[in-house]
Each structure stands twice: as C-alpha cells, then as structure tokens.
Amino acid sequence: MNYMLIKIGEFDISECWDGVFYKKLSDYPNITDWEIQNVLDFIRYEEENGRTCRIETQREILKKIEDYKQRKSKHRIAPPEIIKECTACPKYKGCMTDLVCHTSPLENAIKIMDSGCLLSPVIARGLTALELKNESRNAANDPQDYFEYIMFAWGNCQAGDRLVMERKLGRFPNDEDLGKDFTPGVRFFFCYDKLVKHPDATFEGVLPLKVKNRVVLSDWVSSIIVPDVYKQEFQSHIPQNLKSKVHYLKNDCADIWEWSGKVYEYAKHFV
C-alpha cells in the first residue's frame, strides 16, 4: 500500500480503514484548527512512511486547510477539553482529553506486568511487521509500520475494550456481547500532557498519539485499572515499583459504555 485517501465529511466516527482515513468534523462543514492539525499529522506520518495522500472534501474545506498551512506556527495546538467528533458515548457525548489509555486482555496484561513495559505488537509477539500485516485479524488492512507502535485511545473511549472482545470472540461483537456478556480488559491510563513528551511519541492524526517500540510503565503510567475478578491471577505479577499504580474495580455495569465511564472516572483520581 503506497497511497492513502483522506475523506473529510459527515461520518459516524473518525477512523482509518483499508487505506481510507474517514475524518469526521465536529461541526461539518466547519473545520477547526485542531481538526486541520489532525489531517496534516496524518499526511506527514503517511509520507514519512512512503505513502502519498489525497484529500477528498468540499472546496471550502480544502481552502481552509491551505490557509492554515500558510499561517501555521511552530507550536502544536492542544486538544480541546472534549472532542465531539464521536458522540456515540452516551454519558460524555465526546472524547475527554485529559487521559489516554491502552487496553489489554488479562493474559496480555500479565505479560506487560512481567516485562514492566507496554510493547509494540512486533516486539510483544516476536513477529515481523509484514507478518502481522498479513494476518487475517488485520481487518482494517493497516500498513505494516502501524505494528511498530503502541496505540492509545482517549481515556473514556470504549474502543480498546471492544477490540479485546473482538479478539476474544474471533468476530465483531454484537450488542449482546457488549451488554450482558461483556468482559472488560485491563486498562493502562496515562496523562495525555505527560505522554506526549515521550521521545518516541508520534502524532498520526487518527489516534490521540502512539509510541514506537515500548513504554516503560514506571516512568509514564498514572494508573492500572484491573477488573476485580482478575485480582487473584494478576496480583502475583505486579512488580514492586508498580504496586501503588494498580487498582481493582468491580464491573457491576450494564454494558461497555457504563464500564468505560466508570473506569475513566476512577482513573481521574490518580492524575
């Protein structure tokens, strides 16, 4: 894959899927400087990895992007307190930007604790990026360099737990899977304003950020939230320098949305 298409418009969410970056605007057809920065981050990252990009959108939006490029400062624009591109979350109606998180199933979370690091898929699984790209579970057809990074979602987002369920089931989860049959993963929370200073952090326009190769937990993590049903299996794997970061939380929630809100609100206490 050496070409990426950027479609800016009205979509359910912003996502990159099979070579297309669907960029949803919070107030279409108006585009904010933050949203323009996302688009330019995506173009920069893709071009650095040998892929050209083309934007498909209204002429007025293209003009605003060009105008921004002419007046762009050297300083990055900080995210708004809440990003309203995705309003699927029933409680927040958007993405809260104080925290980011990485979510893992129990077995992977134990390996993370044993190593003391979040690791990219290439390192964690001991496969090449090309091998990971060619796996059937790469449903989005992500390019191989994507697998050299650890990916993060906004702190109140349910996407990580949804992916955990998808991996568990071997298919896309349905409403029942995300409701009464939902089993949450372990969440590793980080302060966004701190993690952006990681020397290997990258902005690629789709995610809040991603980090290449590894993140040493003792240096960066703010809290690790574990469903309390995993406590007995999990606690023997916690290194001494992370014991104060680990918290157990009961999943007494009706669905993935309620759990995402509960765990995010709990994690905010440890910022």
Region spans (language model):
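NAD-dependent ADP-ribosyltransferases
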Residues: 1-271
